[in-house]
């Protein structure tokens, strides 16, 4: 169990370093190109930022531990180690490991919601501002490192057992008697997930292309319940997307809602804009 636990911890550290670095650099390029770090001022970037945008999607899916990517492999090892410890230990230690399993599962759910909002609001839809509509794709000096980090995430997902074996020397420093053979063998079936997911996506792409062959292609706005002139302002905002989860986690986040009614510039008399914001009452220094 010692070898499994240390291998899982080090692999998880490496996976988070790769995925988070890709996300930080990628969305730094987004902020630089669009001139804003506000999700509500972004949108519509994935179509024009195909390479960097695709890496951001991969990085977000990886950090949310989606099966087939690198962070899922290390989380799988962490769960294996925690559950193995629960079966081997008793009393307070067993309860503590049970709490760790719950905390890991809870944080995974929060990560999925967080990065679904990041990608869905920041990259998809239509541009929510003029700066987002005209944001130029980053050059190779800025986009190249993002692509390399995305490739590293895919490499670890494809060969997690080899990466764990490469970490054997580091594990031996903190746990000289540890054996990482269990960790390496536990990851062999996980390595098959990435080819399986890639094959399924390729099959869907081929079927879609075959079914649409010869049919005219027309681009249009998304369905808006019959409304013929939707605007970018009618899309989900980051606040509205996260509102259900924010309400559920209110006792933990200690948030409060602020509702403002404003009159848009140039609007007819009586027109109002509803603005709803969630703010945290917890000082930022404690977060």
Give names to the regions the model predicted:
Residues 1-39:
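Alpha-helical multi-pass transmembrane bundles of energy-transducing inner-membrane proteins
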Residues 20, 24-27, 36, 75-76, ...:
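Alpha-helical transmembrane segments of polytopic integral membrane proteins
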Residues 28-86, 93-107, 130-155, 228-234:
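Interfacial and helix-entry/exit segments of alpha-helical transmembrane bundles
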Residues 2-4, 85-100, 176-192:
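Membrane-interface segments at the starts/ends of alpha-helical transmembrane spans
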Residues 40-47, 121-128, 172, 222, ...:
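Short amphipathic alpha-helical coupling elements at transmembrane boundaries
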Residues 13, 17-21, 106, 110, ...:
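Hydrophobic transmembrane alpha-helical segments of multi-pass transport and channel proteins
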Residues 160-193, 209-287:
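Aromatic-capped, Gly/Pro-kinked transmembrane alpha-helices
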